[in-house]
Structure formats: structure tokens, C-alpha cells
């Protein structure tokens, strides 16, 4: 018999109350595609969700970033967690008020189960192998992929739309196989 839990969130909390209310959190085995035009905040949203999972809830989180280097992603996360302006971080022109927040953010990140893989142009098979390893070694709980159009499917010789469709199917199979939510970012173009 099912009993009502204290929280209405049955999956991984995103850190966004309204989203969690609508979805009950990110559910195991789900593929969540976040699509939008360039520079609309897809990566920022995914990073915020990953931070909430790994730092706020100690859920081992893998980020496969084919767009940004691990260093760039790390700086974005430090800025987000520490509430420090990105350009100040990049240039090193931090105020005396910024330093404690940066130090706190670095400390939180160093103790969080966040795994960043910035290898370019991964295939679904390569992501599956890496995710399986993280699941086995670290009990992986969430995967973020930034972004699908930078992936390639070695077995597909069709057009790009068919290839992206096949990549989506592979990512859904991965989510079900290792029983974690997978957030895949997708860039929409004008056409």
C-alpha cells in the first residue's frame, strides 16, 4: 500500500520549486530534453539543476560537456554557487566581498560528487560506457549532456535529423538501463 510521503517530490529535486511541483522531481529512467535557441539559458538551467543535485542533495552527478571545457564549466559553477559575476571571475578582478563567496563555492564543489567529462563529440556508446563506470564506482544518480547536436552516432549514415533522433533513443535507453534521469540539452535553429 502506498503512503503519502512528507514531500511531493519523489525524484531528484531540481531546486526550482515550481518545476518540482509540476514534475515531482526528476524521475529515474526519464530522458528530459531541454531545447531552446542559442544563448537562452539551457546550460545555466542544467548547471543549476546539477548543482542542486550534487551539492544540495549529495547525488552523484555526471556532466558530459561537449560545448565547454571542464575549466569553463567549473568557473560557471563557482560563479553560480558563489553569486559572483562571471566576467569578474574570468578577469580575476574580484572585490574583497567576492573572495569569501568564491572560497565557499570552491569548497562546496570540491566536496560534491560532481563528475565533469569534457571530451568532444562523444557517441552515445561512449557516454554509455562512461556512465556505466560512474554508476558502478560512484552510484551515479543524474546525467547532464550539453548538448545533443555535438554528439555523433557512429552507426548512423543518414541525415542529421535521423542521427539526432537515434541519439535521443540511445539516451532514453541509457536512462532506463542505469536507472537515472538524463537531462539532454538540444539547440534549436531557425529552420
PLM regions and their residue ranges:
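Pre-Walker A segment
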Residues: 1-30
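Short hydrophobic/aromatic beta-strand immediately N-terminal to the Walker A/P-loop
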Residues: 32-33, 62
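The conserved Walker
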Residues: 38
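Conserved glycine(s) of the Walker
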Residues: 41
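Residues immediately C-terminal
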Residues: 150, 190
Amino acid at each position: 500500500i502506498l503512503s503519502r510521503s512528507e514531500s511531493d517530490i519523489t525524484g531528484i529535486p531540481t531546486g526550482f520549486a515550481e518545476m518540482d511541483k509540476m514534475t515531482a522531481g526528476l524521475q529515474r529512467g526519464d530522458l528530459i530534453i531541454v531545447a531552446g535557441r542559442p544563448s537562452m539559458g539551457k546550460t545555466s538551467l542544467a548547471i543549476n539543476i546539477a548543482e542542486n543535485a550534487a551539492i544540495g542533495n549529495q547525488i552523484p552527478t555526471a556532466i558530459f560537456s561537449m560545448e565547454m571545457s571542464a575549466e569553463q564549466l567549473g568557473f560557471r559553477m563557482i560563479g553560480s554557487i558563489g553569486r559572483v559575476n562571471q566576467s569578474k571571475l574570468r578577469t580575476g578582478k574580484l572585490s574583497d566581498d567576492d573572495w569569501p563567496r568564491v572560497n565557499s563555492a570552491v569548497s562546496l564543489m570540491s566536496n560534491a560528487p560532481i563528475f565533469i567529462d569534457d571530451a568532444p563529440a562523444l557517441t552515445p556508446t561512449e557516454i554509455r560506457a562512461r556512465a556505466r563506470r560512474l554508476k558502478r564506482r560512484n552510484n551515479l544518480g543524474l546525467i547532464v549532456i550539453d548538448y545533443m547536436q555535438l554528439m555523433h552516432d557512429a552507426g548512423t549514415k543518414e541525415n542529421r535529423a535521423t542521427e539526432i533522433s537515434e541519439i535521443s533513443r540511445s539516451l532514453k535507453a541509457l536512462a532506463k538501463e542505469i536507472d537515472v534521469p538524463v537531462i539532454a540539452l538540444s539547440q534549436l535553429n531557425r529552420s
